[in-house]
C-alpha cells in the first residue's frame, strides 16, 4: 500500500474509532444546542416524539430506531448528572447506562395510549367499556402564559393488575328456551357471564409532564389518554388538565393584550417623565413622555402583549392607563396665584352627558 493511501486509511480508521467511542450526538438528535435549557429539551422531545413515533411512520423501517434514539437523548439530557457525564465523556462515559423504557417517557407527556396520529385522541369503541374521565384544574401564572413552561405533576394512579383466581366478567342477559313437551316451550331470561382472569386495583405513582404553551387560554384542556379511572373489564378513562390562569397583581389579560395602570405625580403629568416597566419575563419596557399626560390617558405598546396561541410570532399590545396623583396638602394662597400665573388658563367649566354613545 502506498504511503499516501496508508495515511488516508489510518485517518479514516481513527475517525471511525472516535465516532464509536463518542457514541450518538444527543444534542443533534433533539435538534438543540449544547446550551439548551431543560425547557428547550422537553419542548424539542415533545415535538419530535409525535413526528417520529413508529405508529405514525409504519413505512419507515428505521422508525423504531429513530424513536429509541430520541428517547435515549431525552433521558440523558433531561437528567443533570447524566448530562454532565455525557458532556464530559460522551455516551460511553455514562456509568449506569440509560435503559428506561422509551414508551414510558412518551407516556409521561401524552398518557398511556398516546394519540391517534391525526391530531385527535383515540376513537372510542362503543363495545369496550371505559373508566370515568378525570378533569383537574391546573393553575398557571401569567408569567407561564407569556413564556411557556413545563409543569411536572406527580399523582397516584389506580391501575388494574392481574391477581390470582378467576372472576365473572362480561355479564349479560340472555333468553333460554326449554321444551316442556310437544309444541310447548318455556322461555326464561337469565344472566350469563364469561370467566376472566381476576384483577385487583393498585396505586402506582405516575409523573406527567404538562406543557404550558405560550399564549394558552383560560379553560383550555390538555388530555392525557388512558390516565383516568380504570375499568376492570375495559380501558381506563382519560385525564384532562383544565387551565386556570391565576390573577396577576400588575397585569390583566384581555385576549392577547395586557393591561396595566401607572400612577404618576401631577408634576410628571405636566412636564413629562421617563420610567421602565418590568415585564412578565423580566425585560424592561421603556416609557418616555415629554408632553402633558392627562388622568386616564392610555399608551399602546405594540408587540408587548401576550403571544398568540396559534402563532407565537404574533403578540398583542401592552395598554398602559395613567393615573395622576394630586397633592394631598392644601396649597397656600401664594402657591395658588403662582400656578394661575404660570398656566394662564381660564375657567372651562362645562356640564355634559359623558356617557352619551354607550
Curated annotation (Swiss-Prot):
Principal location class:
endoplasmic reticulum
Q: Write down any Gene Ontology CC term.
A: nucleus
Q: Please outline how this chain is modified post-translation.
A: Contains high-mannose Endo H-sensitive carbohydrates.
Domain J residue range list: 25-90
Q: Which UniProt keywords apply?
A: Chaperone, Disease variant, Disulfide bond, Endoplasmic reticulum, Glycoprotein, Phosphoprotein, Signal
MF term (GO), any? misfolded protein binding
Q: In which tissues is it expressed?
A: Widely expressed.
Q: Where in the cell is it found?
A: Endoplasmic reticulum lumen
Q: Please name the GO terms of the biological process aspect recorded for this protein, alphabetically.
A: mRNA modification; negative regulation of neurogenesis; positive regulation of ATP-dependent activity; protein folding; protein maturation
Which Pfam families does the annotation name? DnaJ (PF00226), DnaJ_C (PF01556)
* Positions annotated as glycosylated: 261
Q: Which disease is it linked to?
A: Polycystic kidney disease 6 with or without polycystic liver disease: A form of polycystic kidney disease, a disorder characterized by progressive formation and enlargement of cysts in both kidneys, typically leading to end-stage renal disease in adult life. Cysts also occur in other organs, particularly the liver. PKD6 inheritance is autosomal dominant.
Record-given protein name: DnaJ homolog subfamily B member 11
Q: Which organism's genome codes for this protein? A: Homo sapiens (Human)
Amino acid at each position: 500500500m502506498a504511503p499516501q493511501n496508508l495515511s488516508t486509511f489510518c485517518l479514516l480508521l481513527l475517525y471511525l474509532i472516535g465516532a464509536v467511542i463518542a457514541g450518538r450526538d444527543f444534542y443533534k438528535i433533539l435538534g438543540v444546542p449544547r446550551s439548551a435549557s431543560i425547557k428547550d429539551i422537553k419542548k424539542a422531545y415533545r415535538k419530535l416524539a409525535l413526528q417520529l413515533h413508529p405508529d405514525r411512520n409504519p413505512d419507515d423501517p428505521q422508525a423504531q430506531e429513530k424513536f429509541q434514539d430520541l428517547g435515549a437523548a431525552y433521558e440523558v439530557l433531561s437528567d443533570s448528572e447524566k448530562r454532565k457525564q455525557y458532556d464530559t465523556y460522551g455516551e460511553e462515559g455514562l456509568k449506569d447506562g440509560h435503559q428506561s423504557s422509551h414508551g414510558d417517557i412518551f407516556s409521561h407527556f401524552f398518557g398511556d395510549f398516546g394519540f391517534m396520529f391525526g391530531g385527535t385522541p383515540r376513537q372510542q369503541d362503543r363495545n369496550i367499556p371505559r373508566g370515568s374521565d378525570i378533569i383537574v384544574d391546573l393553575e398557571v401564572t401569567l408569567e407561564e402564559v407569556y413564556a411557556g413552561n413545563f409543569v411536572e405533576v406527580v399523582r397516584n394512579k389506580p391501575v388494574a393488575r392481574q391477581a390470582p383466581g378467576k372472576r365473572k366478567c362480561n355479564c349479560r342477559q340472555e333468553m333460554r328456551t326449554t321444551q316442556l313437551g310437544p309444541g310447548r316451550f318455556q322461555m326464561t331470561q337469565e344472566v350469563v357471564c364469561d370467566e376472566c382472569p381476576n384483577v385487583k386495583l393498585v396505586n402506582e405513582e405516575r409523573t406527567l409532564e404538562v406543557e404550558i404553551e405560550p399564549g394558552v387560554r383560560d379553560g383550555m384542556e390538555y388530555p392525557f389518554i388512558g390516565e383516568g379511572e380504570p375499568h376492570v373489564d375495559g380501558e381506563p378513562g382519560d385525564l384532562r388538565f383544565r387551565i386556570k390562569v391565576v390573577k396577576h397583581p400588575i397585569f390583566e389579560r384581555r385576549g392577547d393584550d395586557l393591561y396595566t395602570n401607572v400612577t404618576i405625580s401631577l408634576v410628571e403629568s405636566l412636564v413629562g417623565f421617563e420610567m421602565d416597566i418590568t415585564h412578565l419575563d423580566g425585560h424592561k419596557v421603556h416609557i418616555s413622555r415629554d408632553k402633558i399626560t392627562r388622568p386616564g390617558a392610555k399608551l399602546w405598546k405594540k408587540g408587548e402583549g401576550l403571544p398568540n396561541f396559534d402563532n407565537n410570532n404574533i403578540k398583542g399590545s401592552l395598554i398602559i392607563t395613567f393615573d395622576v396623583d394630586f397633592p394631598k396638602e392644601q396649597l397656600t394662597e401664594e402657591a395658588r396665584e403662582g400656578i394661575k400665573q404660570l398656566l394662564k388658563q381660564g375657567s372651562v367649566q362645562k356640564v355634559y352627558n359623558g356617557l352619551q354613545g354607550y
